[in-house]
Amino acid sequence: MVDGQKMFQTESRWMFTDDKGIEARGDLKWNTERLHQPKDSRQKVLVVDDQNLIADTLAEILNNAGFDAIPAYDGGQALEKASRFHPDWIMTDVLMPRMNGVELAIAIRKNYPKTSILLLSGQAGISEMLEDGRRQGYQFELIAKPVHPLKLIQRITEGA
C-alpha cells in the first residue's frame, strides 16, 4: 500500500503501520457471540479519517466485531455517505484537512441529531476546536489515538 500496510494474522491479532511509520498492533479478545448481531439489526458505523489505512482498518475491525461499518476519507465524503448510509455512529478523526472532525460533527448533529459521535485524535492540541464546538452548544466525546479496538467496540456497545 502507498500509505501504509495492514495485516490480520487471525481474528484475534491485528497490526497496521500508517504513512508516517507509526505502528500499532494488538490482540483482540472478546465474546463474539455477544457482539455479532443479525445483519438487519447491526449498528451502522461511519469511520472517518484522512489516513485511508486507519479508516479502512478500523472499519474492518468493527465489521469483524459484528457492526456494519464503512470508511470515509474526509468530511465532505463523510457527509455524502451519511446521507445514504444513515449511521448510528460516526467515529471521526479530529485533525483533517478542509473540514476538521469537530466541524463534521456539528454538521452531522444539525442534520442527524440522533447519530452518536465519537471523536478520535492523536494530537493533544485540539482543545480549541472542541471549545469552539462547545460554544456553539455541542458536546462530543474524545478518545485519544492510538486506541485499542476493544475500547472503541466497548464504547459503541455501551452507548447504544
Where do the language-model regions lie?
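Charged docking surfaces used in two-component/phosphorelay signaling
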Residues: D56-N64
